[in-house]
């Protein structure tokens, strides 16, 4: 089960929260994971996941991550998903144990051997209460039982030394078929049939008041049905964090003006990115709903990741940021844009409408929603269906990119 817990922590947890939330989690886990306080930025999601497996072998730190998500208002849905995934893993293990107990066949695989040890726990406990002689005759099985009991005790979440979580009793396990790719039954009923909604997206029906920081001009993209549609990107912030937003209803463009306060509901969240479509609600915030966004949140929202950190990322991770174009090489099917900063350089592959855009060396490229990919071990950023590029010419303001 250790691998399953690690999978949940990494793929359904750390990879699904935004950069600010991940930095907050690392800050709270400094003591538990012995992180360098002055150099927390260097730790990537998979490094943190590996460290959590070593520190919390019983559940790979899943309980700590769930408690963290429960304490962040915008991550409560993520906490529910992780709980259901954990229940599903436990339920599948229990069903497998029951099947093994009902079957006369002798387990031969490693998994079956582990399940047999679980059965030994029950049978040995019963025999220990009957006679001492049977206990002596089952010394080998008792050894397995002790190991299982030790593991069972470790499954209970310990008291946190820091503010990451609080002591809590184990959550009752219930049967659930939910996964990160299937929203909860409650959300499924209200989820519209919209192809823009990614698999595993979480519906947030409760209202959230945010301040608009930036918004791009609308641009065309090709939908999964091969239809040409329009959308735009935006960045919004609350009092505690910022979000990148994909807006698939361009009629809302006027509401997404800088420093405007809006209240959104019935929106989706996927991997820390908010998605607003035709069924979402976006209203002007009432005066009493106005919020004050700290300057540090605004700075973090406008900051670009270091290229060395991008290179350490997990394949599929989405990146946003402004980078200097170092080299441009036009090919038949795509264009290679080499971007560079003080920490290194990386190739950006543009195809479709991002093939041979109007830019030259020294220009600034503002990348929106580019995905990290590895080919032959080399990391590169590639465009996707919702990618967008803005070009800043030397001494000029940002402008939407155009094909030469």
UniProtKB/Swiss-Prot annotation:
Keywords on record: Nucleus, Transcription, Transcription regulation
UniProt GO BP: activation of innate immune response; cellular response to interferon-beta; response to bacterium
Comp. bias intervals (Basic and acidic residues): 137-147
Region span, Disordered: 85-198
Role, per record: May act as a transcriptional regulator in the myeloid lineage. Inhibits cell growth via p53/TP53 and RB1-dependent and independent pathways.
Protein name: Interferon-activable protein 205-A
Residues covered by the Pyrin domain: 1-88
Keyword hit for Phosphoprotein: no
Entry's Gene Ontology molecular function annotations: double-stranded DNA binding
Chain intervals with Low complexity compositional bias: 102-112, 122-132, 168-185
Gene3D superfamilies: Death Domain, Fas, Nucleic acid-binding proteins
Record-annotated HIN-200 domain positions: 192-392
Similarity annotation: Belongs to the HIN-200 family.
Biased composition (Polar residues): 186-197
